[in-house]
Amino acid sequence: MEVAYKEDLLTSFAEAFSIDRLTDVRVFFAPGRVNLIGEHTDYNGGYVFPGALTNGTYMVIKLRDDGEYHLRSANFDTSVVFRNSDLRFDPKDDWGNYPKGIIAELAKLGVDLPGATIYFYGNIPNGAGLSSSASIGMVTAYGLTQCSGIDIDRVTLAKLCQRMENDFIGVSTGLMDQFAVGMGKKDHALFLNTSSLEYDQVPLILKGYKLVITNSNKRRGLADSKYNERRRECEIGLEQLRKKQTNLSHLGEVTEEMFAELGPVIEDELIYRRVRHVVTEDARVLAAVSALKAGELQTFGELMKASHLSLREDYDVTGVELDTLFDLQASAPGCIGTRMTGAGFGGCTVSIVHEEEITAFQTVVSKGYEKKIGYKPTFYVTELGDGVNEWKGGA
């Protein structure tokens, strides 16, 4: 993943819009996110454990006074132009619908924006399950409100970004991605109860190990995937559990002990497996956080592996690419934990690998993956960073 520098971003902004004077121009950054454990639990009111990445989306912005928005991106060829008076979803605007949706949601809150000229640059791969959509949404929301002198707290902005994806884009995302992008902290993972929004910043002390993200290079189109189908299956499971316990509001309330008692009411085997994953994954998150706090990194790694197996066997969201990576990485040199991360159906895995074995790990996994799948994966040795902020820039 490339490193961005403020001077380069300002130059690109000036060239993209033929601007001679860079006055009143500001730069903001929102990270991508990687979820260490706790997958497909966020929309079920369960626990998640994500962290903000040091890679993400940069936004260079200059306010206008004509109610127009002129958008360009280093990552896409198309430019997007629209007005405050026309904030409708438009398929031809493609990626531009994400910032447009944010502006539309802010307008619903009564926020009167003057228009803006905006340039984006992202260094997280799109469709890889590292929350490029939450990243561009949060950087747009945070940057626009900061430039306009409007004080909206980060939790409210995260909820606004979730509404944008749900209502404007049409993807039923949970709140985890936006929350992690907004509330991330360097070298910490975010233990979040997605029902109450109570959270704890837990230090990620890797003691000679590194986080390695492996991109399967199979793009994962979230809106076109079976994400919404899984969400509906969980809703069906919850409805059936309520036959025995009527006061359940979400699956995140169901402990393993409760499921042992209530589970048999679910007669459909597929629905039963979907619910079982959510219940056991919540338990794994709690155990993983406890293991990290106790310095038990090996235990944390084993829980990561168990998470992937549940996502494969009970939730059916892995696929041949992610399963191939998992099988190779679980036995690769220096790897003590690995799992798919994100919604699945392609995208990435996250692994904990000893820093002295990273090259050997990558070699073994790359060769095995290419032999079976036909093309190579891409590796990113990464760390956890801060949430959305005004960016002061590199060199």
UniProtKB/Swiss-Prot annotation:
Signal peptide coordinates: none
GO cellular component: cytosol
Subcellular location: Cytoplasm
Cysteines engaged in disulfide bonds, as pairs: none
Keyword Secreted recorded: no
Purpose: Catalyzes the transfer of the gamma-phosphate of ATP to D-galactose to form alpha-D-galactose-1-phosphate (Gal-1-P).
Name listed for the protein in its UniProt record: Galactokinase
Upper lineage: Bacteria, Bacillati, Bacillota, Bacilli, Bacillales
